[in-house]
């Protein structure tokens, strides 16, 4: 048995999960998520718990078992609590600001870099060197945060760039002059 797949998912109060064939719909206070799963994996809703089971022990079914359970759990947590990723800008003159629904980054290029948040994802700028990406879909929050970080990933010599909060950047020593 998959150790992750055999765990039950507890549905919190205020969240409803409905199954239509192999499509799961999860509604909660933060929003609604719909996802289609592989029809070979069985999803059962009993009271306020979700159980995921697989037909056989072959490698493909074992992989799908844990993945299906993890995605369903992320959907339930997302619509009830939500997800957030914090990014920090480190470097002289690096700053972020919000203009309407756009995030504008000045990170050392000749032009500012702009991002528009997709539906269901919010961008907050509490300080000009800090960005918070919030939303109920873990996939969209992580993707937008990764795209923002990819504009100027942290470099190993001075540590300048955009990094996740708490991310450790491996530092290198520069060349030694003669």
UniProtKB/Swiss-Prot annotation:
What is a single cellular component term in the Gene Ontology annotation? cytosolic large ribosomal subunit
> Where is region (Disordered) located?
159-178
* Keyword match Endoplasmic reticulum: no
Q: Which Pfam families match?
A: Ribosomal_L6
Gene Ontology terms, MF aspect = rRNA binding; structural constituent of ribosome
Q: Can you cite a GO biological process for this protein?
A: cytoplasmic translation
Q: Which residue spans traverse the membrane?
A: none
**What superkingdom heads the lineage?**
Bacteria
What the entry lists under InterPro entries is as follows: Ribosomal_uL6-like (IPR000702), Ribosomal_uL6-like_a/b-dom_sf (IPR036789), Ribosomal_uL6_a/b-dom (IPR020040), Ribosomal_uL6_bac-type (IPR019906), Ribosomal_uL6_CS (IPR002358)
Signal peptide range equals none
PROSITE patterns cross-referenced by the UniProt entry: RIBOSOMAL_L6_1
Q: Supply the alphabetized keyword list.
A: Ribonucleoprotein, Ribosomal protein, RNA-binding, rRNA-binding
Q: Which NCBIfam families match?
A: L6_bact
Q: How does it assemble?
A: Part of the 50S ribosomal subunit.
Q: Which family does it belong to?
A: Belongs to the universal ribosomal protein uL6 family.
List the HAMAP family.
Ribosomal_uL6_B
Question: What does this gene product do?
Answer: This protein binds to the 23S rRNA, and is important in its secondary structure. It is located near the subunit interface in the base of the L7/L12 stalk, and near the tRNA binding site of the peptidyltransferase center.
Q: What is this protein called?
A: Large ribosomal subunit protein uL6
What is the species listed in this Swiss-Prot or TrEMBL entry? Listeria monocytogenes serotype 4b (strain CLIP80459)
What is the organism lineage in this UniProt record?
Answer: Bacteria, Bacillati, Bacillota, Bacilli, Bacillales
